């Protein structure tokens, strides 16, 4: 990818902080090889497209280090679960065999699995030696009759967020707009309900949580053409240009997709979240507002009233156990503010939140929810996290899996909230799942046990000693 193309991706007019100085390649830090590069960002953004063959063109470590980093789930095809790579070695680089290996890898994927498309992810090594991945993909598509989409996402281009944008740009350039949506199935129309087509951009169906939101949209007559990219299919991505409204779910990483769909097709968009009662209700209201359908607005308010009453009644027995508990939330991106709302719905107080991967808009949402004097953690090493826990008397640390051992060493209750988790927390009914896990974590008897002084640390008392002989006989 040329430098001017990277600069264009970094230039995002829809961001209010767009005029600030931008840095394409972040300064390397210890531990940075665990991901967070452009390749990692591009792959986790598109890997949830379940029926596509995903080929990583590069050394095998690139495929191995990033595969399955995001716990997305599919309701059908599982081809995305198969890790494919060209496994470049030193000999391939020296002898100039990298492009040939890629061509044969595409052929093997097409002949073995018959996918509707193949996504090829460029990495650092082939980018440095000058492989023409675009030309190879074009030749393979003509030869095998299957779309082959190049995703030029070499890790040294920049950060994980840039990789998300590169992935979105590839979809805009090669996929979106290449097919029209299917007509509504015969007999699926409901009298008096007009069906509206919508997209969800940046929804990854972590632990299947989107499946708990989809019934709400179906009830309102909102047909989801595509979720980019959780539980998505290639043919669905092709039809995204025909949506009436786009919802930006995962912060601003794929904002370029929403903006360009608006510029090209006039599709309005908004940013929202399905975490917590308040944010879920607001997202449904925003759909109704932008679609400008009075009947939809009335039905939306009725659904919100019903669901809120039901979930608040179910939460009432738990509230007394959680109200007033103090939370240190250390995560990034959209979760730095979207998880605050459900915790506040439970009467809990978020004393600090992590903003390492948060945009300026994310930070503005945090201040709106928690006040201007909120504690934001840009860096969260073990020392900083434990110091913050002590300083703010936090009862629980809610963070990603990599912080689990920090919490355990500090004897602090810990709940994993990041993309690797096994439980979904999106939608109204999954609030109960979040509450259950928070309660289980806080009330686990192990915390009382590990905080209790060991017997050998308790000063011996003369009165506590048995009288008499060595065995206490009188």
From Swiss-Prot:
One of its GO terms (biological process) is molybdopterin cofactor biosynthetic process. Gene3D superfamilies: Nitrogenase MoFe cofactor biosynthesis protein NifE, C-terminal (3.40.50.12380), Nitrogenase molybdenum iron protein domain (3.40.50.1980). The keyword tRNA processing does not apply. GO terms for molecular function: nitrogenase activity. Pathway: Cofactor biosynthesis; Fe-Mo cofactor biosynthesis. PROSITE patterns: NITROGENASE_1_1 (PS00699), NITROGENASE_1_2 (PS00090). InterPro entries: Nase/OxRdtase_comp1 (IPR000510), Nase_comp1_CS (IPR000318), NifE (IPR005973), NifE-like (IPR049939). Keywords: Nitrogen fixation. This protein may play a role in the biosynthesis of the prosthetic group of nitrogenase (FeMo cofactor). Belongs to the NifD/NifK/NifE/NifN family. This is Nitrogenase iron-molybdenum cofactor biosynthesis protein NifE. It comes from Azotobacter vinelandii. The lineage of its organism: Bacteria, Pseudomonadati, Pseudomonadota, Gammaproteobacteria, Pseudomonadales.
